[in-house]
């Protein structure tokens, strides 16, 4: 069995990993912790035309990569504490699309993700979670 855990570094994401780990530690599953952030091009567009090829964009891109690695490493640590071995995957692009791409190419049995990652969202499910639920070809466990 292969499980894809998704994290954006939020407390809710970590709680989803923790809650699921306690349920699946007897399955001896292979686990991957995926963290997705904006692509280099998107960072440039967000910062504006004058920053697209600047040092600011490169520095921002490095900071994003560092944070994504930290988020995924935290997820792996939670899983290891529950006796589950996991590997880290980092992706850059539109978050839901990258989760769906990894789910399909990695031959996972199901996806685990938090209901929403951003605090203050008034909806029951966040936009990324809604998109993954609508388009995933495998079960999605939402915590």
Per-range role (PLM):
Residues 77-111:
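Structural beta-alpha unit
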Residues 2-55, 84:
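Small/aliphatic-rich secondary-structure junction motif
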Residues 110-134:
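Glycine-rich, Arg-bearing micro-motifs that act as flexible, cationic patches
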Residues 53-70:
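A short acidic, glycine-rich active-site loop
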Residues 32, 87, 141:
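Conserved beta-strand positions in the Rossmann-like core of class I SAM-dependent methyltransferases
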Residues 1-2, 143:
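Absolute protein N-terminus
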Residues 48-52, 105-107, 129-131:
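Short, hinge-like loop/turn segments at secondary-structure boundaries
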Residues 1, 109, 137:
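Conserved acidic residues
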């Amino acid at each position: 069995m292969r499980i894809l855990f998704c994290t954006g570094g939020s407390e809710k994401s970590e709680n989803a990993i923790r809650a699921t780990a306690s349920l699946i530690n007897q399955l001896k599953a292979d686990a991957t912790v995926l963290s997705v952030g904006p692509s280099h091009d998107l960072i440039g567009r967000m910062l504006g035309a004058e920053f697209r090829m600047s040092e600011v964009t490169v520095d921002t891109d490095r900071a994003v990569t560092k944070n994504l690695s930290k988020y995924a490493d935290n997820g792996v640590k939670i899983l290891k504490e529950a006796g589950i071995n996991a590997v880290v995957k980092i992706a850059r692009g539109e978050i839901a699309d990258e989760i769906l791409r990894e789910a399909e190419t990695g031959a996972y049995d199901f996806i685990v993700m938090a209901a929403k990652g951003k605090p203050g969202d008034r909806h029951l499910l966040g936009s990324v979670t809604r998109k993954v639920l609508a388009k995933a070809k495998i079960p999605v466990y939402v915590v």
